[in-house]
């Protein structure tokens, strides 16, 4: 008896209804023309890591908890004297999510984390880059349920970039709206 492979809820919803809705809306003739999610990039810049290397490691640990995948510490490429920054100093961390972990993260972001943001009025509908990708900033990483509020020493912000295969911003907006992204009106 063959076991069925795990399919995230949002991926199943995309295969079942979203893909056909987008095909009708934009009149695609080929299945490969329908936009889909490609990857999600989480980036956390830590300016204080210049003075204390442990802060970059702590931020990478928190980002790993949020993403469910190991985050990599990013290092400076050039020295900038005004920021007291030397070459190869840790300045942040990042992680790229694809496939199953990407769909699970987007599900947690839209349904759990964003509703926990104070004074949340919706996502900015103008944050598309012109090529079908969407970026948003989160001011406090403690809105995610994986982070224990009592054990966090500092609260950091992070950038979330959702990359899609859409050719235009309108196609990407329709795709993300179908995934229940709460855009402002």
UniProtKB/Swiss-Prot annotation:
PROSITE patterns in alphabetical order: RIBOSOMAL_L5
The entry's keywords: Ribonucleoprotein, Ribosomal protein, RNA-binding, rRNA-binding, tRNA-binding
GO molecular function, one term: tRNA binding
Ribonucleoprotein is among the record's keywords: yes
GO cellular component terms, A-Z: ribonucleoprotein complex; ribosome
Superkingdom of origin: Bacteria
Keyword Cell wall biogenesis/degradation annotated: no
GO biological process, one term: translation
Record's function text: This is one of the proteins that bind and probably mediate the attachment of the 5S RNA into the large ribosomal subunit, where it forms part of the central protuberance. In the 70S ribosome it contacts protein S13 of the 30S subunit (bridge B1b), connecting the 2 subunits; this bridge is implicated in subunit movement. Contacts the P site tRNA; the 5S rRNA and some of its associated proteins might help stabilize positioning of ribosome-bound tRNAs.
Quaternary structure annotation from Swiss-Prot or TrEMBL: Part of the 50S ribosomal subunit; part of the 5S rRNA/L5/L18/L25 subcomplex. Contacts the 5S rRNA and the P site tRNA. Forms a bridge to the 30S subunit in the 70S ribosome.
HAMAP family registered for this protein in UniProt: Ribosomal_uL5_B
Family matches, as NCBIfam families: PRK00010.1
Family: Belongs to the universal ribosomal protein uL5 family.
Protein name as it appears in the record: Large ribosomal subunit protein uL5
Species for this entry: Nitrobacter winogradskyi (strain ATCC 25391 / DSM 10237 / CIP 104748 / NCIMB 11846 / Nb-255)
């Amino acid at each position: 008896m063959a076991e069925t492979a795990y399919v995230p809820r949002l991926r199943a919803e995309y295969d079942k209804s979203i893909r056909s809705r987008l095909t009708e809306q934009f009149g695609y003739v080929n299945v490969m023309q329908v936009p889909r999610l490609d990857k999600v990039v989480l980036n956390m810049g830590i300016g204080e890591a210049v003075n204390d290397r442990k802060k970059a490691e702590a931020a990478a640990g928190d980002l790993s908890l949020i993403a469910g995948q190991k985050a990599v510490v990013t290092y400076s490429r050039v020295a900038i004297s005004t920021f007291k920054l030397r070459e190869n100093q840790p300045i942040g961390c990042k992680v790229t999510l694809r496939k199953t972990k990407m769909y699970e993260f987007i599900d947690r972001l839209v349904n759990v984390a964003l509703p926990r943001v104070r004074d949340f009025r919706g996502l900015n509908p103008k944050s598309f880059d012109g090529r079908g990708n969407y970026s948003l900033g989160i001011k406090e990483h403690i809105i995610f349920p994986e982070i224990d509020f009592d054990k966090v020493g500092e609260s950091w912000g992070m950038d979330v970039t959702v990359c899609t295969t859409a050719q235009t911003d309108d196609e990407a907006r329709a795709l993300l709206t179908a995934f229940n992204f709460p855009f402002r009106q």
